[in-house]
Protein backbone atom coordinates (compact mmCIF):
# COMPACT_ATOMS: atom_id res chain seq x y z
CA UNK A 1 0.00 0.00 0.00
CA UNK A 2 1.49 3.32 -1.08
CA UNK A 3 1.96 6.00 1.60
CA UNK A 4 0.08 8.36 -0.76
CA UNK A 5 -3.07 6.31 -0.18
CA UNK A 6 -3.58 7.30 3.46
CA UNK A 7 -6.90 8.95 2.59
CA UNK A 8 -8.35 5.50 1.83
CA UNK A 9 -6.54 3.59 4.60
CA UNK A 10 -6.02 5.71 7.75
CA UNK A 11 -8.71 6.51 10.31
CA UNK A 12 -10.98 9.16 8.70
CA UNK A 13 -10.53 11.82 11.40
CA UNK A 14 -6.75 11.40 11.38
CA UNK A 15 -6.56 11.33 7.57
CA UNK A 16 -8.66 14.48 7.16
CA UNK A 17 -6.78 16.36 9.89
CA UNK A 18 -3.36 15.50 8.42
CA UNK A 19 -4.60 16.37 4.94
CA UNK A 20 -6.41 19.61 5.83
CA UNK A 21 -3.81 21.24 8.11
CA UNK A 22 -1.34 22.16 5.32
CA UNK A 23 -4.27 23.60 3.35
CA UNK A 24 -5.34 25.72 6.34
CA UNK A 25 -1.77 26.91 6.92
CA UNK A 26 -1.38 27.71 3.24
CA UNK A 27 -4.55 29.79 3.25
CA UNK A 28 -3.41 31.74 6.31
CA UNK A 29 -0.02 32.31 4.72
CA UNK A 30 -1.73 33.66 1.61
CA UNK A 31 -3.65 36.15 3.75
CA UNK A 32 -0.45 37.29 5.45
CA UNK A 33 1.22 37.74 2.06
CA UNK A 34 -1.72 39.75 0.70
CA UNK A 35 -1.51 42.15 3.63
CA UNK A 36 2.29 42.45 3.27
CA UNK A 37 1.96 43.15 -0.45
CA UNK A 38 -0.55 45.93 0.22
CA UNK A 39 1.67 47.44 2.93
CA UNK A 40 4.69 47.56 0.59
CA UNK A 41 2.76 49.29 -2.19
CA UNK A 42 1.06 51.69 0.21
CA UNK A 43 4.23 52.59 2.13
CA UNK A 44 6.67 52.99 -0.75
CA UNK A 45 4.45 54.27 -3.56
CA UNK A 46 1.46 55.89 -1.89
CA UNK A 47 -2.26 55.62 -1.33
CA UNK A 48 -3.09 56.21 -5.00
CA UNK A 49 -0.96 53.23 -6.06
CA UNK A 50 -2.56 51.12 -3.34
CA UNK A 51 -5.99 52.17 -4.58
CA UNK A 52 -5.00 51.27 -8.17
CA UNK A 53 -3.93 47.77 -7.14
CA UNK A 54 -7.01 47.40 -4.94
CA UNK A 55 -9.28 48.49 -7.78
CA UNK A 56 -8.10 45.44 -9.75
CA UNK A 57 -8.82 42.98 -6.93
CA UNK A 58 -12.51 42.37 -7.63
CA UNK A 59 -11.81 41.66 -11.30
CA UNK A 60 -8.76 39.47 -10.73
CA UNK A 61 -10.72 37.47 -8.14
CA UNK A 62 -13.25 36.53 -10.83
CA UNK A 63 -10.48 35.18 -13.06
CA UNK A 64 -8.87 33.36 -10.13
CA UNK A 65 -12.25 31.73 -9.45
CA UNK A 66 -12.30 30.46 -13.03
CA UNK A 67 -8.91 28.84 -12.46
CA UNK A 68 -9.98 27.33 -9.14
CA UNK A 69 -13.26 26.03 -10.55
CA UNK A 70 -11.50 24.46 -13.52
CA UNK A 71 -9.14 22.71 -11.11
CA UNK A 72 -12.07 21.22 -9.18
CA UNK A 73 -13.35 19.39 -12.25
CA UNK A 74 -10.01 17.76 -12.95
CA UNK A 75 -9.25 17.16 -9.28
CA UNK A 76 -12.41 15.18 -8.54
CA UNK A 77 -11.73 12.74 -11.38
CA UNK A 78 -8.00 12.46 -10.60
CA UNK A 79 -8.91 11.58 -6.99
CA UNK A 80 -11.46 9.02 -8.11
CA UNK A 81 -9.14 7.20 -10.50
CA UNK A 82 -6.30 7.43 -7.97
CA UNK A 83 -8.51 5.78 -5.35
CA UNK A 84 -9.46 3.08 -7.86
CA UNK A 85 -5.75 2.67 -8.77
CA UNK A 86 -6.63 3.22 -12.40
CA UNK A 87 -3.45 5.16 -13.09
CA UNK A 88 -3.87 5.08 -16.86
CA UNK A 89 -7.13 7.07 -16.70
CA UNK A 90 -5.71 9.26 -13.95
CA UNK A 91 -2.75 10.31 -16.13
CA UNK A 92 -5.08 10.78 -19.12
CA UNK A 93 -7.16 13.21 -17.03
CA UNK A 94 -4.00 15.06 -15.97
CA UNK A 95 -2.75 15.41 -19.55
CA UNK A 96 -6.16 16.34 -20.97
CA UNK A 97 -6.79 18.97 -18.30
CA UNK A 98 -3.36 20.58 -18.62
CA UNK A 99 -3.61 20.86 -22.41
CA UNK A 100 -7.21 22.14 -22.33
CA UNK A 101 -6.77 24.63 -19.53
CA UNK A 102 -3.46 25.93 -20.90
CA UNK A 103 -5.29 26.86 -24.11
CA UNK A 104 -8.14 28.40 -22.08
CA UNK A 105 -5.75 30.42 -19.91
CA UNK A 106 -3.96 31.84 -22.96
CA UNK A 107 -7.29 32.87 -24.51
CA UNK A 108 -8.45 34.48 -21.25
CA UNK A 109 -5.08 36.20 -20.83
CA UNK A 110 -5.26 37.69 -24.33
CA UNK A 111 -8.87 38.76 -23.74
CA UNK A 112 -8.02 40.36 -20.40
CA UNK A 113 -4.97 42.16 -21.79
CA UNK A 114 -6.88 43.59 -24.75
CA UNK A 115 -9.92 44.69 -22.76
CA UNK A 116 -8.29 45.78 -19.47
CA UNK A 117 -9.08 49.44 -20.08
CA UNK A 118 -12.72 48.75 -21.00
CA UNK A 119 -13.27 46.50 -17.97
CA UNK A 120 -11.80 49.02 -15.53
CA UNK A 121 -13.95 51.80 -17.00
CA UNK A 122 -16.99 49.53 -16.67
CA UNK A 123 -16.18 49.14 -12.97
CA UNK A 124 -16.17 52.96 -12.69
CA UNK A 125 -12.53 53.14 -11.61
CA UNK A 126 -11.66 56.73 -10.57
CA UNK A 127 -9.94 58.66 -13.37
CA UNK A 128 -6.87 59.55 -11.30
CA UNK A 129 -5.90 55.88 -10.84
CA UNK A 130 -7.32 54.42 -14.07
CA UNK A 131 -4.07 54.25 -16.05
CA UNK A 132 -2.11 52.73 -13.16
CA UNK A 133 -4.84 50.13 -12.61
CA UNK A 134 -4.88 49.22 -16.32
CA UNK A 135 -1.08 48.86 -16.32
CA UNK A 136 -1.20 46.54 -13.30
CA UNK A 137 -4.00 44.50 -14.84
CA UNK A 138 -2.24 44.05 -18.19
CA UNK A 139 0.93 42.74 -16.56
CA UNK A 140 -1.27 40.44 -14.47
CA UNK A 141 -2.89 38.99 -17.59
CA UNK A 142 0.50 38.37 -19.24
CA UNK A 143 1.22 35.98 -16.36
CA UNK A 144 -2.27 34.51 -16.26
CA UNK A 145 -1.27 31.13 -17.83
CA UNK A 146 1.25 30.65 -14.99
CA UNK A 147 -1.41 31.46 -12.38
CA UNK A 148 -3.80 29.03 -14.06
CA UNK A 149 -1.17 26.29 -14.20
CA UNK A 150 -0.20 26.79 -10.55
CA UNK A 151 -3.81 26.57 -9.34
CA UNK A 152 -4.62 23.54 -11.50
CA UNK A 153 -1.52 21.68 -10.31
CA UNK A 154 -2.18 22.59 -6.66
CA UNK A 155 -5.56 20.89 -7.03
CA UNK A 156 -3.87 17.90 -8.69
CA UNK A 157 -1.44 17.55 -5.79
CA UNK A 158 -4.24 17.56 -3.21
CA UNK A 159 -6.19 15.08 -5.36
CA UNK A 160 -3.47 12.46 -4.84
CA UNK A 161 -3.09 13.26 -1.13
CA UNK A 162 -0.07 15.58 -1.45
CA UNK A 163 -1.29 18.67 0.42
CA UNK A 164 2.15 19.54 1.82
CA UNK A 165 3.69 20.24 -1.60
CA UNK A 166 1.24 23.07 -2.49
CA UNK A 167 1.90 24.54 0.98
CA UNK A 168 5.65 24.56 0.34
CA UNK A 169 5.20 26.07 -3.11
CA UNK A 170 2.84 28.72 -1.74
CA UNK A 171 5.30 29.71 0.98
CA UNK A 172 8.12 29.87 -1.57
CA UNK A 173 6.02 31.92 -4.00
CA UNK A 174 4.82 34.33 -1.30
CA UNK A 175 8.28 34.94 0.18
CA UNK A 176 9.75 35.39 -3.31
CA UNK A 177 6.96 37.82 -4.21
CA UNK A 178 7.54 39.91 -1.09
CA UNK A 179 11.28 40.16 -1.76
CA UNK A 180 10.65 40.97 -5.42
CA UNK A 181 8.13 43.63 -4.33
CA UNK A 182 10.66 45.22 -1.99
CA UNK A 183 13.36 45.19 -4.68
CA UNK A 184 11.24 46.44 -7.58
CA UNK A 185 8.93 48.81 -5.70
CA UNK A 186 11.17 50.17 -2.93
CA UNK A 187 14.58 49.59 -4.51
CA UNK A 188 14.09 50.25 -8.22
CA UNK A 189 11.13 52.60 -7.81
CA UNK A 190 9.03 50.86 -10.47
CA UNK A 191 5.77 51.58 -8.64
CA UNK A 192 2.62 49.72 -9.67
CA UNK A 193 4.41 48.15 -12.64
CA UNK A 194 7.05 46.74 -10.27
CA UNK A 195 4.39 45.22 -8.00
CA UNK A 196 2.69 43.56 -10.97
CA UNK A 197 6.00 42.35 -12.43
CA UNK A 198 7.04 40.88 -9.07
CA UNK A 199 3.80 38.90 -8.96
CA UNK A 200 4.28 37.71 -12.54
CA UNK A 201 7.84 36.47 -11.89
CA UNK A 202 6.93 34.73 -8.61
CA UNK A 203 3.91 33.02 -10.16
CA UNK A 204 5.90 32.04 -13.24
CA UNK A 205 8.65 30.35 -11.23
CA UNK A 206 6.10 28.65 -8.94
CA UNK A 207 4.06 27.44 -11.91
CA UNK A 208 7.10 25.88 -13.61
CA UNK A 209 8.29 24.30 -10.34
CA UNK A 210 4.79 22.88 -9.77
CA UNK A 211 4.84 21.30 -13.21
CA UNK A 212 8.30 19.75 -12.75
CA UNK A 213 7.52 18.36 -9.29
CA UNK A 214 4.14 17.00 -10.37
CA UNK A 215 5.62 15.23 -13.40
CA UNK A 216 8.24 13.65 -11.14
CA UNK A 217 5.41 12.34 -8.92
CA UNK A 218 3.55 10.95 -11.92
CA UNK A 219 6.57 8.81 -12.84
CA UNK A 220 5.78 6.67 -9.79
CA UNK A 221 2.68 5.35 -11.52
CA UNK A 222 3.82 3.27 -14.47
CA UNK A 223 1.05 3.06 -17.06
CA UNK A 224 0.18 3.95 -20.63
CA UNK A 225 -2.16 6.91 -21.15
CA UNK A 226 -3.73 9.07 -23.83
CA UNK A 227 -2.49 12.65 -24.18
CA UNK A 228 -6.02 13.90 -24.82
CA UNK A 229 -9.46 12.34 -24.36
CA UNK A 230 -12.57 14.29 -25.37
CA UNK A 231 -14.91 12.14 -23.26
CA UNK A 232 -12.87 12.74 -20.12
CA UNK A 233 -12.81 16.46 -20.93
CA UNK A 234 -16.63 16.47 -21.02
CA UNK A 235 -16.69 14.66 -17.67
CA UNK A 236 -14.39 17.30 -16.20
CA UNK A 237 -16.50 20.14 -17.56
CA UNK A 238 -19.67 18.70 -15.99
CA UNK A 239 -18.00 19.24 -12.62
CA UNK A 240 -15.87 22.28 -13.43
CA UNK A 241 -18.56 24.49 -14.98
CA UNK A 242 -20.82 24.54 -11.87
CA UNK A 243 -17.76 25.21 -9.70
CA UNK A 244 -16.67 28.10 -11.93
CA UNK A 245 -20.20 29.53 -11.92
CA UNK A 246 -20.50 29.20 -8.16
CA UNK A 247 -17.15 30.77 -7.31
CA UNK A 248 -17.25 33.59 -9.86
CA UNK A 249 -20.88 34.45 -9.05
CA UNK A 250 -20.03 34.72 -5.35
CA UNK A 251 -17.20 37.14 -6.19
CA UNK A 252 -19.56 39.25 -8.29
CA UNK A 253 -22.18 39.09 -5.53
CA UNK A 254 -19.72 40.40 -2.96
CA UNK A 255 -19.00 43.32 -5.29
CA UNK A 256 -22.73 44.11 -5.21
CA UNK A 257 -22.85 43.90 -1.40
CA UNK A 258 -19.89 46.28 -1.26
CA UNK A 259 -21.89 48.73 -3.38
CA UNK A 260 -24.75 48.51 -0.84
CA UNK A 261 -22.41 49.28 2.07
CA UNK A 262 -20.62 52.24 0.45
CA UNK A 263 -23.49 54.78 0.83
CA UNK A 264 -23.50 54.32 4.63
CA UNK A 265 -20.31 56.36 4.83
CA UNK A 266 -16.63 55.95 5.46
CA UNK A 267 -16.83 54.87 9.11
CA UNK A 268 -19.53 52.26 8.51
CA UNK A 269 -17.50 50.99 5.58
CA UNK A 270 -14.38 50.84 7.76
CA UNK A 271 -16.18 48.75 10.38
CA UNK A 272 -17.66 46.46 7.75
CA UNK A 273 -14.31 46.04 6.00
CA UNK A 274 -12.56 45.21 9.28
CA UNK A 275 -14.97 42.38 10.02
CA UNK A 276 -14.87 41.14 6.43
CA UNK A 277 -11.16 40.52 6.96
CA UNK A 278 -11.91 38.61 10.16
CA UNK A 279 -14.62 36.63 8.37
CA UNK A 280 -12.17 35.78 5.60
CA UNK A 281 -9.59 34.50 8.09
CA UNK A 282 -12.00 32.21 9.95
CA UNK A 283 -13.69 31.17 6.71
CA UNK A 284 -10.36 29.83 5.47
CA UNK A 285 -10.54 27.10 8.10
CA UNK A 286 -13.96 25.86 7.03
CA UNK A 287 -13.21 26.26 3.32
CA UNK A 288 -10.00 24.24 3.74
CA UNK A 289 -11.84 21.45 5.54
CA UNK A 290 -14.45 21.38 2.76
CA UNK A 291 -11.70 21.32 0.13
CA UNK A 292 -10.03 18.44 1.97
CA UNK A 293 -13.28 16.48 2.07
CA UNK A 294 -13.66 16.46 -1.73
CA UNK A 295 -10.54 14.42 -2.63
CA UNK A 296 -11.06 12.23 0.44
CA UNK A 297 -14.57 11.37 -0.73
CA UNK A 298 -13.55 11.01 -4.36
CA UNK A 299 -10.64 8.67 -3.58
CA UNK A 300 -12.81 6.47 -1.37
CA UNK A 301 -15.59 6.52 -3.96
CA UNK A 302 -13.12 5.29 -6.56
CA UNK A 303 -11.92 2.60 -4.15
CA UNK A 304 -15.60 1.63 -3.50
CA UNK A 305 -15.21 2.29 0.23
CA UNK A 306 -18.61 3.91 0.69
CA UNK A 307 -18.73 3.45 4.46
CA UNK A 308 -15.49 5.44 4.81
CA UNK A 309 -17.18 8.34 3.00
CA UNK A 310 -19.85 8.51 5.71
CA UNK A 311 -17.25 8.30 8.47
CA UNK A 312 -15.15 10.97 6.77
CA UNK A 313 -18.17 13.27 6.50
CA UNK A 314 -18.88 12.83 10.21
CA UNK A 315 -15.19 13.48 10.99
CA UNK A 316 -15.33 16.71 8.98
CA UNK A 317 -18.39 17.82 10.96
CA UNK A 318 -16.50 17.17 14.21
CA UNK A 319 -13.58 19.31 12.98
CA UNK A 320 -16.00 22.05 11.94
CA UNK A 321 -17.69 22.01 15.35
CA UNK A 322 -14.34 22.30 17.15
CA UNK A 323 -13.21 25.25 15.03
CA UNK A 324 -16.65 26.93 15.29
CA UNK A 325 -16.47 26.79 19.09
CA UNK A 326 -12.93 28.16 18.95
CA UNK A 327 -14.04 31.02 16.67
CA UNK A 328 -16.98 31.83 18.97
CA UNK A 329 -14.76 32.01 22.07
CA UNK A 330 -12.15 34.19 20.35
CA UNK A 331 -14.71 36.61 18.89
CA UNK A 332 -16.90 36.82 22.00
CA UNK A 333 -13.97 37.64 24.28
CA UNK A 334 -11.75 39.68 21.95
CA UNK A 335 -14.03 41.35 19.37
CA UNK A 336 -13.20 44.88 20.54
CA UNK A 337 -9.46 44.22 20.51
CA UNK A 338 -9.71 42.58 17.08
CA UNK A 339 -11.61 45.58 15.70
CA UNK A 340 -8.98 47.93 17.10
CA UNK A 341 -6.25 46.14 15.12
CA UNK A 342 -7.89 47.43 11.94
CA UNK A 343 -9.61 50.61 13.11
CA UNK A 344 -6.99 51.91 15.54
CA UNK A 345 -7.53 55.01 17.66
CA UNK A 346 -9.07 56.91 14.76
CA UNK A 347 -12.05 54.57 14.53
CA UNK A 348 -15.33 56.20 15.55
CA UNK A 349 -18.04 54.73 17.75
CA UNK A 350 -20.03 53.88 14.61
CA UNK A 351 -17.11 51.98 13.10
CA UNK A 352 -16.64 49.92 16.26
CA UNK A 353 -20.39 49.26 16.56
CA UNK A 354 -20.59 48.02 12.98
CA UNK A 355 -17.47 45.89 13.30
CA UNK A 356 -18.39 44.43 16.69
CA UNK A 357 -22.02 43.77 15.79
CA UNK A 358 -21.17 42.03 12.54
CA UNK A 359 -18.33 40.04 14.12
CA UNK A 360 -20.32 38.75 17.11
CA UNK A 361 -23.23 37.79 14.85
CA UNK A 362 -20.88 35.69 12.72
CA UNK A 363 -19.36 34.11 15.82
CA UNK A 364 -22.74 32.69 16.85
CA UNK A 365 -23.32 31.03 13.49
CA UNK A 366 -19.95 29.96 12.05
CA UNK A 367 -21.05 26.36 12.64
CA UNK A 368 -23.58 26.80 9.80
CA UNK A 369 -20.75 27.73 7.46
CA UNK A 370 -18.75 24.72 8.62
CA UNK A 371 -21.46 22.13 8.00
CA UNK A 372 -22.29 23.78 4.66
CA UNK A 373 -18.68 23.53 3.48
CA UNK A 374 -18.33 19.91 4.61
CA UNK A 375 -21.55 18.87 2.87
CA UNK A 376 -20.62 20.75 -0.30
CA UNK A 377 -17.27 18.96 -0.19
CA UNK A 378 -19.00 15.57 -0.21
CA UNK A 379 -21.21 16.60 -3.14
CA UNK A 380 -18.18 17.74 -5.14
CA UNK A 381 -16.31 14.56 -4.31
CA UNK A 382 -19.21 12.44 -5.55
CA UNK A 383 -19.68 14.65 -8.61
CA UNK A 384 -23.25 15.65 -7.66
CA UNK A 385 -22.96 19.16 -9.05
CA UNK A 386 -26.47 20.37 -9.93
CA UNK A 387 -27.77 20.59 -6.33
CA UNK A 388 -24.36 21.92 -5.26
CA UNK A 389 -24.77 24.83 -7.68
CA UNK A 390 -28.43 25.41 -6.75
CA UNK A 391 -27.65 25.42 -3.01
CA UNK A 392 -24.85 27.96 -3.40
CA UNK A 393 -26.97 30.19 -5.64
CA UNK A 394 -29.77 30.16 -3.03
CA UNK A 395 -27.21 31.09 -0.38
CA UNK A 396 -26.03 34.04 -2.46
CA UNK A 397 -29.59 35.06 -3.40
CA UNK A 398 -30.64 35.27 0.26
CA UNK A 399 -27.62 37.38 1.17
CA UNK A 400 -28.02 39.73 -1.80
CA UNK A 401 -31.80 40.11 -1.63
CA UNK A 402 -31.87 41.00 2.07
CA UNK A 403 -28.96 43.43 1.64
CA UNK A 404 -30.44 45.10 -1.44
CA UNK A 405 -34.05 45.29 -0.22
CA UNK A 406 -33.78 45.94 3.53
CA UNK A 407 -30.38 47.53 4.21
CA UNK A 408 -31.08 50.82 2.36
CA UNK A 409 -34.40 51.19 4.24
CA UNK A 410 -33.67 49.82 7.71
CA UNK A 411 -29.90 50.08 8.18
CA UNK A 412 -26.58 48.40 7.54
CA UNK A 413 -27.35 45.62 10.04
CA UNK A 414 -29.38 43.86 7.36
CA UNK A 415 -26.22 43.40 5.29
CA UNK A 416 -25.08 40.67 7.66
CA UNK A 417 -28.31 39.43 9.26
CA UNK A 418 -28.98 37.15 6.28
CA UNK A 419 -25.48 35.63 6.14
CA UNK A 420 -26.14 32.66 8.50
CA UNK A 421 -29.60 32.18 6.95
CA UNK A 422 -27.91 31.73 3.58
CA UNK A 423 -25.42 29.26 5.03
CA UNK A 424 -28.21 27.25 6.68
CA UNK A 425 -30.36 27.17 3.53
CA UNK A 426 -27.33 26.05 1.53
CA UNK A 427 -26.64 23.23 3.99
CA UNK A 428 -30.26 22.01 4.03
CA UNK A 429 -30.46 21.86 0.23
CA UNK A 430 -27.07 20.15 -0.08
CA UNK A 431 -27.84 17.67 2.70
CA UNK A 432 -31.22 16.79 1.20
CA UNK A 433 -29.56 16.18 -2.17
CA UNK A 434 -26.88 14.05 -0.53
CA UNK A 435 -29.41 11.85 1.27
CA UNK A 436 -31.47 11.46 -1.90
CA UNK A 437 -28.63 10.75 -4.31
CA UNK A 438 -26.27 8.65 -2.25
CA UNK A 439 -28.02 5.25 -2.17
CA UNK A 440 -29.20 5.38 -5.78
CA UNK A 441 -26.08 6.76 -7.47
CA UNK A 442 -23.09 5.66 -5.43
CA UNK A 443 -21.96 3.03 -7.96
CA UNK A 444 -22.55 4.97 -11.19
CA UNK A 445 -19.53 5.85 -13.31
CA UNK A 446 -18.21 9.42 -12.95
CA UNK A 447 -19.34 10.79 -16.31
CA UNK A 448 -23.01 10.13 -15.46
CA UNK A 449 -22.95 12.41 -12.45
CA UNK A 450 -22.67 15.99 -13.63
CA UNK A 451 -25.04 18.60 -14.97
Region roles according to the model:
Residues 28, 32-50, 120-127, 183-190, ...:
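Helix-terminus/linker motif at the lipid-water interface of multi-pass membrane proteins
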Residues 71, 140-158, 166-174, 195-208, ...:
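Short runs within selected transmembrane alpha-helices of multi-pass transporters and secretion channels
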Residues 18-37, 139, 173, 202-206, ...:
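Transmembrane helical elements of multi-pass membrane transporters/channels
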Residues 50-110, 147-166, 271-335, 369-383, ...:
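Small-residue-rich hydrophobic transmembrane alpha-helices
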Residues 7-44, 58-73, 77, 102-109, ...:
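N-terminal transmembrane alpha-helices
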Amino acid sequence: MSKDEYLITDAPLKALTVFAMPMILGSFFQQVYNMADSIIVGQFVGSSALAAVGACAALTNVFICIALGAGVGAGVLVSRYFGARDYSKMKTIVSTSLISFLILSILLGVFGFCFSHSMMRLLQTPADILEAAVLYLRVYFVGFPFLFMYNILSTMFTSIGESKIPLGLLIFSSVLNIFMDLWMVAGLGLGVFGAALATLIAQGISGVLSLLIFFSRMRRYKSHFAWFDGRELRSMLRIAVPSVLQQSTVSIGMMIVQAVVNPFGTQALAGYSATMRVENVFSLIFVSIGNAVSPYVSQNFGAKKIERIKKGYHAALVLDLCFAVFAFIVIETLHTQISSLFLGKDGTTLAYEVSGGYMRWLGYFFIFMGIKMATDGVLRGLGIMRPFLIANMVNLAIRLSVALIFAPRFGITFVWLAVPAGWLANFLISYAALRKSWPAEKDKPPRERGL
